[in-house]
């Protein structure tokens, strides 16, 4: 993997010209009438409370499967936070792999929203401090674990990645080396799909859709036959959906490097995998607090204490802890 282009790391203190203004961004999430509802409310409320310069930026929440559109009550709760809610038939695949929602919603947003930058987030996230979004074609975080990624030639998954690269017209060697965030394994670039900042007119998300749907047409499941049943923030996703796990991130990573070299890696303050830190440390830049937690927890009562415990471990401020605890207590009443 020697000789590949390296991604640029996010500076701890970017200059004013490197930072996106609030009127340049729109936040994009997917939400459905399932456990995502309460997660979306918590995420949007945290942005409004702790988002700093971005706290009043527009948020668009999309239900891409109208059969799972939000109830009027849930819609009103999001609208009270200044969220624009959209329900339209973007995902008509019938696939149990729910991440297709994010793929088709991102492609729709690139074609239809006016802001020059999209901040695409999974719903199972919480802002704990003001973010700083960088003026780059793409901003991302590495995947947490190797999972469906490839370490390069000789890796059992390299043929899968090579075929995906072919859909984008690039060689696998185009993908730069990267280290996974948790298990620290060397891989070809694979980015977490739950946090990305993309320049809208570049078309990364539409190309991601095209690559993924080409793989769907060929039934290319990276974890086919593994027997894995992934536990996600909506619960166990099922064996069939699990066989596709990581495929959206592969398509995204290949789409990025087929279109640009201007890629920024955000540091450890962003997309913190809270669900994996109960028995692990998580180094933060000296003197800085966590910004964005990706908790991956269903928000039932049994997961509140583990989430709050990890937030204390990360040294989230007392104000953030008290606010989150109050929000979680309120969610149990919904």
Q: Positions of the model-derived regions?
A:
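Glycosyltransferase catalytic domains, chiefly GT-A lineage
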Residues: 2-334
């Amino acid at each position: 993997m020697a000789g590949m282009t390296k991604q640029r790391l996010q500076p701890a203190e970017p200059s004013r010209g490197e930072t996106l203004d609030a009127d340049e961004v729109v936040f994009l999430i997917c939400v459905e009438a399932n456990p995502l509802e309460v997660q979306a409310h918590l995420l949007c409320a945290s942005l409004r409370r702790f988002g700093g310069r971005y706290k009043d930026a527009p948020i668009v929440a999309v239900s891409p499967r109208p059969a799972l559109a939000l109830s009027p009550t849930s819609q009103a709760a999001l609208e009270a936070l200044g969220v624009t809610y959209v329900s339209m038939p973007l995902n008509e695949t019938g696939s149990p792999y729910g991440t297709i929602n994010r793929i088709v919603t991102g492609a729709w947003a690139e074609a239809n929203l006016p802001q020059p930058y999209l901040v695409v987030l999974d719903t199972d996230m919480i802002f704990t401090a003001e973010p700083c979004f960088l003026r780059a074609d793409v901003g991302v975080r590495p995947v947490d674990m190797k999972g469906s990624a490839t370490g390069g030639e000789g890796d059992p998954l390299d043929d899968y990645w090579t075929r995906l690269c072919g859909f984008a017209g690039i060689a696998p060697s185009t993908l730069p080396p990267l280290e996974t965030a948790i298990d620290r394994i060397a891989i070809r670039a694979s980015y977490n799909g739950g946090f990305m900042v993309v320049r809208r007119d570049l078309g990364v998300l539409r190309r991601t859709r095209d690559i993924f749907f080409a793989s769907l047409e060929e039934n290319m499941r990276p974890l086919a036959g593994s027997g894995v049943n992934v536990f996600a923030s909506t619960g166990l996703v099922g064996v069939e959906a699990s066989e596709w796990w990581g495929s959206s991130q592969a398509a995204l990573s290949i789409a990025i490097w087929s279109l640009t070299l201007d890629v920024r890696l955000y540091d450890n303050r962003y997309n913190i995998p809270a669900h994996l830190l109960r028995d692990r440390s998580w180094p933060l830049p000296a003197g800085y607090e966590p910004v964005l937690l990706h908790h991956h927890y269903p928000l039932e009562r049994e997961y509140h204490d583990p989430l709050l415990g990890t937030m204390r471990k990360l040294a989230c401020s007392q104000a953030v802890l008290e606010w989150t605890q109050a929000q979680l207590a309120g969610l149990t009443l919904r």
